[in-house]
Amino acid sequence: MKLNIKTIHLIVVSIFLSISTVSFADVVEVFQWKAFPGKGQDMLESMSKAAKIYASEGGQVSIDAHNIGSTQLINYVIRWDNSKDYARSKDLQRSSKAWADFWAESNANPAGELVASFSANNLDPTKKASDFKGSYVYSAAIWKVNPGKDLALITRFMEAKPILEAAGARVEIYAGGWGAPGEYHYVLMYDSW
């Protein structure tokens, strides 16, 4: 039996998706915040305090200012290596004195408002939270997939990936979780502008 390249590619992508849905790596939560007027620095300081708590519990945090498409929004991004570490961190939060103290302080003098939040899972099961250490310039294209068209969209993403990587981008593909059902986030990352 002869298989053409397109059929082989489809089989590989299908296997990749099947494995990914069971063994997601790089679990991420994104919280988009907007500072109250005159409270931008206070909000960043509060985010830094929370980042230290997350780090002590196995999470990795990045704090990113939006550049295009928003007004003064800050993404607070928490990553875990896998679903098990994510669940462990969530369990720790329930009984954490550090979190109770943090939220008591933050609620007494709020510095911003939560605008949106969502979770996502990297489709590449080899990715870990530590793969995202550092500071990156990135763009995220968010795609809402039509029912039954997931595989076609992922196939297109995978076809474009080597082209973009040859141009210097690092490409990461995420499936949306809570707050982003039916979405795929196609993220292009660069070391600098």
Predicted segments — roles?
Residues 1-7:
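N-terminal secretory signal peptides that target proteins for export/translocation
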Residues 9-20:
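Bacterial N-terminal signal peptides
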